[in-house]
């Protein structure tokens, strides 16, 4: 089985200059934890995850808490977060895979790197995203005990 067989095609993406609030809203509305960050040419430039957003929100809060009072801390963190762009919190230079790579290889990369997803790139452009859930769904369809069940409705 290849990555192409399991990946999410045409994943939801975000621009590096989008406000962090837009990333939060998009992830919440679309119920995703990973957003590939692409430039205006569709080239992958990085990834922003729910973990990146938590770090962007809470790291300044801790610094503020240690250096100021609690009331001023919350006001300052809110203002800082509102001014931040995706590029300020995203991960640059992410590990990628190709559509034709074996899914087992992509899964091994995800496990070893502790990645929740891998962008799928062809010719420098994002064509898909393979997530932990995609790998589990693909695995579930190969197990004899669950063959015949619809993984989109029966298991999740």
What are these regions (language model features)?
Residues 1-156:
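Tandem CBS (Cystathionine beta-synthase) repeat/Bateman regulatory domains
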């Amino acid at each position: 089985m290849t990555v192409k067989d399991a990946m999410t095609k045409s994943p939801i993406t975000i621009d590096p200059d989008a406000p962090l609030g837009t990333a939060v809203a998009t992830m919440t509305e679309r119920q995703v934890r990973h957003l590939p960050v692409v430039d205006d040419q569709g080239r992958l430039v990085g990834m922003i995850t729910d973990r990146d957003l938590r770090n962007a929100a809470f790291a300044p809060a801790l610094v503020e808490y240690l250096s100021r009072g609690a009331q001023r801390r919350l006001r300052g963190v809110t203002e800082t977060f509102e001014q931040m762009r995706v590029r300020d919190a995203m991960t640059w230079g992410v590990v990628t895979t190709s559509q034709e790579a074996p899914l087992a290889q992509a899964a091994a990369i995800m496990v070893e790197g502790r990645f929740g997803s891998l962008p799928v790139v062809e010719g420098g452009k994002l064509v898909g995203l393979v997530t932990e859930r995609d790998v589990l769904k693909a695995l579930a369809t190969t197990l004899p005990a669950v063959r015949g069940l619809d993984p989109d409705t029966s298991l999740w």
